[in-house]
A protein has these predicted regions:
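Bacterial N-terminal signal peptides that target proteins for export
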Residues: 2-12
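Bacterial N-terminal signal peptides
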Residues: 11-21
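Primarily the internal scaffold of c-type cytochrome electron-transfer domains
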Residues: 53-90, 120-462, 468-474, 480-486, ...
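Conserved, well-structured interaction surfaces
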Residues: 105, 109-116, 126
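Extracellular Ig-like/FN3 beta-sandwich strand-entry sites
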Residues: 489-491
Length: 544
């Protein structure tokens, strides 16, 4: 009897021991499993060594300070981006989760890649406002940060495989060795210090960090068109500056980085800790076209939880504005002549950039403001004046959201305005500013870069509308004739200005019906700053 009772007792002991061993094995496995949060660092870790940098002339070129005032650093804080995602989620509630995840790819890249590694989609709204409620939000708030860009692998860059931010990062899941790519060959000492101080991040020289294809990964944005029930209905080429650059003369002579990250002329160190002088360092200012956003970040820095200091943001606004005024466009007056009943002249608008002008986000527009005054200083003709609310006098789209201003090869009336812009159309052919509703361009007459052949351009970057058939609208520039009738009392003073606005009136005011916090907040910002929403890129004057 005693022996028969001992068998089940032993069996129970064996089962318990095996169960404990299995549990212990799972605990060890979970503890040793790589944590996706370790694949990146927030920018403050990098700033510790890459600050306190100056040129021999005393210019502060500290990488961290320049970066944190840039649009890249504040990509997730951008109030217009937040408002736009909310608008799309209201328009397409069944696709809201997918839209948030898709948009976070480039606006919250570190957080997106962490979530992706954990098998989750990034929920943008779960992280608004960005107030560092817990450690996990630090990556969401960090925008396009150092460790994301410098860990992007070369594989697939410049191909559809990596567009929309679908890049691979170096060393993902490797706790002891994650490569951080840079343009310079690291010395042994700094390499060892960085690896130990960052717990596994290793600097590695790689030429692709200066390749335009790296920028093209996020600056090629093809959105998913959404229909009823959030159903995917196709794709739409929302932003294509990389392809525009490829189709221009600039792809042979200038990279994205050479313009948007201006090179330091002198040899300078890139780290404050005994760094050797490096020739060819690029400033991390990421100059672009959105002075309006940088101004809003400064004015509302507390509400938006902006890390950059007021003077840094103001410097960024000034730098962006100066860049636009000096390096983006040129205007000329040609063929001035008197006619039997007035006068005529040609305005030539030249694009000095390596992509369309304006480019990227379709809220951007440029236009010609023309004034003609007689000898007494009276205005006898004006087209394209800017209203105090940010709208353009005579622009059909600003007056009526269902209409838009066509392209003109010749302007004869003050209510005709030459506006260089993209106009989006939905599946019904109606004008829209809804990114997930857009299926095609109804108009795209943004000024082409030099060397851009509109006849051979791919459909995604094609010229659309009347400009397509105008021989004067060509690579590098366009020419528009103005014919003014009834003018008397010359000589006449003619002034031609090319204006630019990062967020057009219609794109801002189409948010009015959306009563959620983010759209209403941005609209209040825009209305308060409406007189500062546009600047003059170039101008020309003439008398005859």
């Amino acid at each position: 009897m005693e022996m028969r009772r001992s068998v089940p007792v032993m069996a129970i002991v064996v089962v318990v021991v095996l169960a404990l061993a299995a549990l212990r094995s799972r605990e060890v496995s979970a503890a040793s499993r790589p944590n996706p949060h370790d694949d990146f660092h927030t920018a403050d870790r990098c700033v510790a060594c890459h600050n306190g940098l100056k040129t021999p002339q005393g210019e502060n070129i500290s990488i961290g300070l320049q970066w944190r005032a840039s649009v890249m650093a504040n990509s997730s804080r951008d109030p217009y981006w937040q408002a736009s995602i909310r608008r799309e989620s209201i328009d397409h509630p069944d696709a809201s989760v997918d839209a948030q995840d898709e948009c976070s790819t480039c606006h919250m890249p570190a957080q997106h890649l962490i979530d992706k590694a954990e098998g989750k989609k990034t929920e943008v709204f779960a992280r608004f406002p960005l107030l560092k409620k817990h450690e996990r939000d630090a990556f969401a708030e960090d925008g396009v940060n150092c460790s994301v860009c410098h860990q992007i692998e070369r594989k697939g860059l410049g191909t559809p495989q990596t567009f929309n931010g679908n890049v691979e990062v170096a060393g993902a899941g490797n706790q002891n060795h994650r490569e951080e790519y840079g343009p310079f060959l690291p010395d042994t000492g700094h390499k060892a210090v960085m690896q130990s101080s960052t717990k596994g991040f290793v600097p590695q020289q790689a030429i692709h960090i200066r390749d335009s294809a790296l920028c093209g990964s996020c600056h090629t944005l093809i959105t998913t068109v959404r229909g009823p029930g959030g159903k995917a209905m196709g794709q739409f080429p929302e932003q294509m500056p990389y392809q525009e650059w490829q189709h221009s003369d600039y792809n042979k002579k200038q990279s994205c980085q050479s313009c948007h990250m201006p090179q330091v002329a002198e040899a300078v160190p890139i780290t404050a800790l005994y760094g050797p002088n490096r020739v060819g360092m690029h400033r991390h200012v990421f100059i672009g076209g959105n002075f309006l956003l940088q101004g809003m970040l400064n004015e509302h820095r507390e509400e938006l939880d902006v890390a950059a200091q007021p003077e840094e943001l103001q410097e960024a606004v000034n730098r962006t504005s100066e860049f636009l005024r000096t390096q983006s466009a040129k205007v000329e007056l040609l063929d001035l002549r008197k006619t039997a009943d007035g006068l005529s002249f040609v305005v030539k608008a030249q694009n000095l950039t390596g992509h369309k002008l304006p480019t990227a986000y379709p809220s951007r527009r440029a236009w010609l403001h023309i004034t003609v005054k007689d000898s007494a200083g009276r205005t006898v003709f004006e087209s394209g004046a800017l209203n105090p609310d940010g709208s353009i006098v005579g622009n059909d789209n600003d007056a009526d959201p269902l209409k838009f201003e066509p392209y003109y090869s010749e302007i004869t009336s003050p209510d005709q305005v030459e506006i260089f812009e993209p106009i989006l159309g939905d599946s019904q052919g109606h004008v829209t500013t809804g990114l997930l509703s857009a299926v095609r361009y109804l108009k795209d007459d943004r000024i082409l870069p030099a060397g851009f052949d509109k006849a051979s351009a791919e459909p995604d970057i094609a010229v659309v509308g009347g400009a397509h058939d105008d021989p004067q609208f060509a690579g590098g520039s366009t020419q528009i004739r103005y014919v003014i009738r009834g003018g008397q009392g010359g000589p006449y003073q003619i002034k031609a200005e090319l204006w630019y606005q990062p967020i057009g009136f219609r794109w801002a005011h189409n948010l009015e019906p959306y009563k959620a916090a983010e759209p209403q907040r941005f609209l209040s910002y825009y209305e308060a700053d409406s007189r500062k929403t546009a600047i003059v890129l170039a101008e020309a004057q003439g008398t005859f």
